[in-house]
């Protein structure tokens, strides 16, 4: 078959297949055009999930009749000046309008501030009519009807109207977060109305509009700079997480992106604080020299490529971790409110029912404290009491619930108070000056062990204890190969292993601070994790995560009875340890109930 030149209409339809995948793609391109035109108000109207109707109205600069005629031609744009190395606009290819016009019925009405009348042009399946004068206000109205009518095969791959409408809503949300100075309105016949009034420079207020007040109440500000790259935004506290990554938003020079490098850096930053299978909530904006980032790597401009990806990854991980450390033990207020609602009874008096007042951030059962700041007298706390956690437990030890020594009265003034009892051999009940604290002993000790190991990692190899008889662990050969390849790194953590035949590993030393532990279970888990890391980020940046795994295996278990001095030692260590308000998996280690809250539970005024 002879080679021949494709028609302009067919070329545009091919381009539409890359740029306009679905109605949401068309909405994104049209909203970007409006933003590039300086619009401060953008209204989007849809019908039939955007397939029947998609209209975008803005109050931007508008176009002259001559520019309008050029705008529907392929690769005609006002946003490039001969170089792809300095792109400062959202759009730049000049493909969106001709691509949409080739597969739909497109109408554009526009007017500039200097013009006395507007101009309109229509394109149907790639064929355009002449520009004609029309009545119009300053700005542009782009109306798309019967999207993909010229390529009916594409309609077979469209999702339901509800799904397509949801995709358009997500586009509007992302744009609204990126541009808080712009008012966005989305309306439709299928209850898809959204309205985001402009918030000026208050980015957190816009995020509250889009993500809800819960995010505002549980957000930590991010602001860091490294080698000319600046990262700003907000990230949720670890206990404010979701079951998917849909509420992770990233912007590069104002452009919404879904970049794998950025998303993996967010995961790495929360690796030791968010449970596996859960995802943190974050809105991050990266400002960088346009010459150091390539936005021309994907037709939809949703992916970018950085000249120095290591710099960007390090900046994101470091900035988030520093912010989390700065916030100390802050936990999600929503988790506290849900917990209280779960066991707070309805109050009845005769036929009257008095609803309980909702919890606020100020009355949340989670109370952050400054690590070390309030732990007066920790240096005098008997270290032997806490060191008992690393020793075998006497299951029959008595649970202290009787008298509390006079010294405990002073301990009640500490942030976590004085231990009064142990419930179900797992929860420590402590009394404070104005309420009580319930501590999960396993989660708390797990965090303390991890922090000890992490500190030791940066100073020297973790002290190890030799096993009298090496423990032999049978594993597949490929798992053995991975473990032996990283034996030197395990040694830094106090775990000494060596090959024992083709399909077994001998464990000769374990970390001394963990006492007796399930060495075989630990080795098997490490083998599983290594199998995943070898295809991901590598092991070098995950030593702390290994320390968290070891801490989980070696911390005091649920079901162990503790003496009063052991419980108080644990409380004092928690007060002196940064990040002790949550375990390595992101779960809270304690909750606090104010005396006033307890009285409210019983209907006392």
Swiss-Prot record:
Keywords assigned by UniProt, alphabetized: DNA damage, DNA repair
GO molecular function, one term: mismatched DNA binding
GO BP field: mismatch repair
Superkingdom in the source lineage: Bacteria
Gene Ontology CC annotation, any one: mismatch repair complex
Matching PROSITE patterns: DNA_MISMATCH_REPAIR_1
Pfam families in alphabetical order: DNA_mis_repair, HATPase_c_3, MutL_C
SUPFAM superfamilies: ATPase domain of HSP90 chaperone/DNA topoisomerase II/histidine kinase (SSF55874), DNA mismatch repair protein MutL (SSF118116), Ribosomal protein S5 domain 2-like (SSF54211)
Keyword DNA damage: yes
Biological function: This protein is involved in the repair of mismatches in DNA. It is required for dam-dependent methyl-directed DNA mismatch repair. May act as a 'molecular matchmaker', a protein that promotes the formation of a stable complex between two or more DNA-binding proteins in an ATP-dependent manner without itself being part of a final effector complex.
Family membership noted in the UniProt record: Belongs to the DNA mismatch repair MutL/HexB family.
Name of the protein in question: DNA mismatch repair protein MutL
